[in-house]
Amino acid sequence: MSDDEHHFESSDAGASKTYPQQAGNIRKGGHIVIKGRPCKVVEVSTSKTGKHGHAKCHFVAIDIFTSKKLEDIVPSSHNCDVPHVNRVDYQLIDISEDGFVSLLTDNGSTKDDLKLPTDEALLTQLKNGFEEGKDIVVSVMSAMGEEQMCALKEVGPK
């Protein structure tokens, strides 16, 4: 036995933000990581195998948070990172002065770390509905450590 003390840093549970998937199996409507950003695939085209090398997949995708268009070309036999994308609905409790929202989770606790959406139409709809006293349920999309409000629906007046 040694007299050395070992210290291990504790961190998250080790759940990966992405999982591998073969490029040839990623379809339109699926998700992919391009340039480190989680994206939704809007177009896939495959080129045939040439004299040298593999068949290639050309992906055109939209960043799910910024809506920017990104493209990538990957050999169809290679693995690509696919983000774990989750969408959760929360009930809106309050909109704070500093640009954050207070949301009610399924288990009754509150979530106060989410900023107001950057999408102007969604922001206007959210503020107007809240001021009118309507019950609003917001959909929050999360992937790769980022979260953003992506949709809302009115459940009716209080």
UniProtKB/Swiss-Prot annotation:
SUPFAM superfamilies: Nucleic acid-binding proteins, Translation proteins SH3-like domain. The modification Hypusine is found at residue 51. Residues 1-10 have a biased composition (Basic and acidic residues). Induction: Up-regulated at post-transcriptional level by iron deficiency. It comes from the Eukaryota. InterPro entries: IF5A-like (IPR001884), IF5A-like_N (IPR048670), NA-bd_OB-fold (IPR012340), Rib_uL2_dom2 (IPR014722), Trans_elong_IF5A_hypusine_site (IPR019769), Transl_elong_IF5A_C (IPR020189), Translation_prot_SH3-like_sf (IPR008991). Disruption phenotype: No visible phenotype, but presence of extra root protoxylem cell files. Keywords: Hypusine, Initiation factor, Phosphoprotein, Protein biosynthesis. GO terms for biological process: positive regulation of translational elongation; positive regulation of translational termination. One of its GO terms (cellular component) is mitochondrion. Expressed in the vascular tissues of roots, stems and leaves. Localized in phloem companion cells rather than sieve-tube members. Not expressed in xylem or procambium. Detected in root tips and in the chalazal tissue of fertilized ovules. Residues 1-23 are annotated as: Disordered. One of its GO terms (molecular function) is ribosome binding. The modification Phosphoserine is found at residue 2. Gene3D superfamilies: 2.30.30.30, Nucleic acid-binding proteins. NCBIfam families: eIF_5A. Belongs to the eIF-5A family. Translation factor that promotes translation elongation and termination, particularly upon ribosome stalling at specific amino acid sequence contexts. Binds between the exit (E) and peptidyl (P) site of the ribosome and promotes rescue of stalled ribosome: specifically required for efficient translation of polyproline-containing peptides as well as other motifs that stall the ribosome. Acts as a ribosome quality control (RQC) cofactor by joining the RQC complex to facilitate peptidyl transfer during CAT tailing step. This is Eukaryotic translation initiation factor 5A-3.
